[in-house]
């Protein structure tokens, strides 16, 4: 029996503005986000004794601590695999709090991903990954399979072949996200919704992906404060309890290129995450009132819905077409606009939106939301959360 479910909660969220050129260092972005989250929780930097971030983050825990007035650290950790780390940072923070290792842990991610190193350029546009991953890329890069969009296009084309999905089916994900972003003043695409025709007319990046199937490249930072549920109840905001937190890596897992499995149209690592989340929380898909699904590329939203039990394999296209991801639908999704509409902060801004949904303060609040399921990056070893109200 896990000691984790309900033992810890997210009590504070904070972010910088989301832009295309922040004009400041990644360390400054990290510190601004961390301080904003601490203030939102009604705490002081001196209360913090733990920090968690991504292995990809350039702002080390000790430098964030030094520059924010945080003192001694009893817990510090990093989670790997790019966007797959997002919910994993909260899992590690919650485990530290639940076991008494630390009392106040801040999770953060900050980068200049548009004005600095652009992930969209893939391995051709930045220093190549080292170690064993470089050997795996040797089977891809020399043949021109260099960028995340290209890697996902391979998956998307096979999914279309197997289940009859179309570019329009992918486009409906983008339309919903941009609709939600259009009413979110913090979103980059605030007041700029799109139509399915706009999606279809946007230029090809790599078939079958149009430009509007691809997430943004953003500058910004996001942070979250995790404390015990008991302590969170005495802080300013209604706590978002962590009812489930899990990581998952599937059989024959690769980084965005798991093409060697017997069946490549699913994302079994997300299925593994979902199984753990439901088991920990005692919930099932019908109990989930809203979702934040990692949307770096629209095609990968469809198999997430299937792996997590919201619809059967191959039926996500119909689930979406029926309006289920809309504010008034069965599963309001990415109410902040997602990474397509608000910003690409490796999924951390999505966790913050889940907290707002539990608090009842989202700009696109779909009524009372008791439980929110959040996912991290897909195509890589990944993670997920179920956040909910105090029971």
Swiss-Prot record:
Domain of life from the UniProt record: Bacteria
Mutagenesis or variant effect for residue 294 to F: Almost loss of activity. Loss of activity
InterPro entries registered for this protein in UniProt: Thiolase, Thiolase-like, Thiolase_C_2, Thiolase_N
Molecular functions per Gene Ontology: acyltransferase activity, transferring groups other than amino-acyl groups; lyase activity
Catalytic activity as recorded in UniProt: 17-hydroxy-3-oxochol-4-en-22-oyl-CoA = androst-4-ene-3,17-dione + propanoyl-CoA
Gene Ontology BP terms: bile acid catabolic process; lipid catabolic process
Keyword Nucleotide-binding among record annotations: no
Consequence of changing residue 344 to F: 322-fold decrease in catalytic efficiency. Loss of activity
Disulfide-bonded cysteines: none
EC number from the UniProt entry: 4.1.3.-
Pfam families in UniProt: Thiolase_C_1 (PF22691), Thiolase_N (PF00108)
Keyword set, alphabetical order: Bile acid catabolism, Lipid degradation, Lipid metabolism, Lyase, Steroid metabolism
Functional description taken from the UniProt entry: Probably involved in bile acid degradation. In vitro, when associated with the ChsH1/ChsH2 hydratase, catalyzes the retroaldol cleavage of 17-hydroxy-3-oxo-4-pregnene-20-carboxyl-CoA (17-HOPC-CoA), forming androst-4-ene-3,17-dione and propionyl-CoA. The in vivo substrate is probably a closely analogous bile acid degradation metabolite.
Protein family (similarity comment): Belongs to the thiolase-like superfamily.
Database matches in PANTHER family: ACETYL-COA C-ACETYLTRANSFERASE (PTHR42870), NON-SPECIFIC LIPID-TRANSFER PROTEIN-LIKE 2 (PTHR42870:SF1)
NCBIfam families: PRK07855.1
Protein name, per record: Steroid side-chain-cleaving aldolase
């Amino acid at each position: 029996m896990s000691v984790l479910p309900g033992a810890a909660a997210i009590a504070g969220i904070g972010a910088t503005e989301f832009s295309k050129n922040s004009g400041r260092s990644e360390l400054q972005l990290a510190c601004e986000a961390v301080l904003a989250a601490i203030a939102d929780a009604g705490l002081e930097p001196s209360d913090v004794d733990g920090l968690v971030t991504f292995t990809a983050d350039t702002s080390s825990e000790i430098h964030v601590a030094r520059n924010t007035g945080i003192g001694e650290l009893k817990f510090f950790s990093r989670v790997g695999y790019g966007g797959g780390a997002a919910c994993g940072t909260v899992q590690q923070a919650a485990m530290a709090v639940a076991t008494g290792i630390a009392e106040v842990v801040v999770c953060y991610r900050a980068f200049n991903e548009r004005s600095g190193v652009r992930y969209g350029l893939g391995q051709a546009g930045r220093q190549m990954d080292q170690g064993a991953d470089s050997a795996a890329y040797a089977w891809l890069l020399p043949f021109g399979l260099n960028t995340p969009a290209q890697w996902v296009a391979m998956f998307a084309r096979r999914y279309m072949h197997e289940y009859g999905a179309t570019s329009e089916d992918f486009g409906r994900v983008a339309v919903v996200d941009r609709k939600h972003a259009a009413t979110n003043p913090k979103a980059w695409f605030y007041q700029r919704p799109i139509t399915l025709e706009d999606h279809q007319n946007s230029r090809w990046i790599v078939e079958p992906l149009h430009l509007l199937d691809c997430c943004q490249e953003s500058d910004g930072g996001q942070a979250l404060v995790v404390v015990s549920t008991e302590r969170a109840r005495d802080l300013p905001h209604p706590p978002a309890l962590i009812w489930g937190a899990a990581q998952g890596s599937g059989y024959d897992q690769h980084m965005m290129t798991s093409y060697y499995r017997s069946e490549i149209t699913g994302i079994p690592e997300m299925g593994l995450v979902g199984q753990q989340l439901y088991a920990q929380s005692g919930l099932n898909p019908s109990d989930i009132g809203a979702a934040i699904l990692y949307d770096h590329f629209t095609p990968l939203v469809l198999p997430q819905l299937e792996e997590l039990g919201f619809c059967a394999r191959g039926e996500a296209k119909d689930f979406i077409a029926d309006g289920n991801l809309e504010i008034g639908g069965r599963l309001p999704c990415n109410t902040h606009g997602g990474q397509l509409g608000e910003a690409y902060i490796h999924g951390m801004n999505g966790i913050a939106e889940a907290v707002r949904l539990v608090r009842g303060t989202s700009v696109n609040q779909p009524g009372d939301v008791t439980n929110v399921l959040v996912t991290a990056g897909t195509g890589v070893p990944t993670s997920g959360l179920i956040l909910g109200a105090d029971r």
